[in-house]
């Protein structure tokens, strides 16, 4: 079963291919059916998100309903991406769950100050993601689950 055309995509931004694979597998094993668009670094995510003409063609460039964002990446780190998203009138409504490799309270506080909606410590476990998504009220509104 695949995501319906009306289900928002989930954008996964992480420079580590292994992490992207594990996160995607975790979400899939938990029953998430949304299409997941993977970005290899922060700059790639910004290029996609700020491609305004893309929103005129939502089939080719769908606006994410949720962004899962790593912090430590080359080119543009997660802080930069988060700040750009949350200061843009068009994008700031997209919920962002930050992915951190350590439960570092300073890092978490900085992410919240920049506008993060939640955070999950890697490796991402479906149960933790589900709990955070539910807390944000996203579980039924954004995520596509099996019927």
Model-predicted regions and their roles:
Residues 122:
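A Lys-centered signature of the CheY-like receiver
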Residues 71-73:
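Receiver (REC) domain active-site loop signature in two-component systems and cognate sites
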């Amino acid at each position: 079963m695949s995501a319906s055309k009306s289900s928002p995509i989930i954008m996964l931004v992480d420079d580590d291919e292994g992490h992207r694979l594990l996160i995607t597998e975790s979400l899939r094993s938990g029953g998430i059916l949304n299409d997941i668009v993977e970005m290899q670094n922060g700059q790639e995510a910004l290029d996609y998100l700020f491609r305004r003409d893309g929103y005129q063609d939502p089939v080719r460039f769908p606006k994410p309903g949720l962004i899962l964002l790593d912090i430590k990446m080359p080119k543009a780190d997660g802080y930069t991406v988060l700040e750009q998203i949350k200061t843009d009138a068009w994008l700031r409504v997209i919920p962002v769950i930050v992915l951190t490799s350590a439960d570092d309270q300073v890092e978490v506080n900085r992410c919240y100050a920049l506008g993060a909606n939640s955070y999950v410590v890697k490796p991402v476990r479906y149960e933790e993601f589900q709990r955070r998504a539910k807390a944000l009220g996203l579980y039924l509104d954004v995520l596509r689950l099996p019927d």
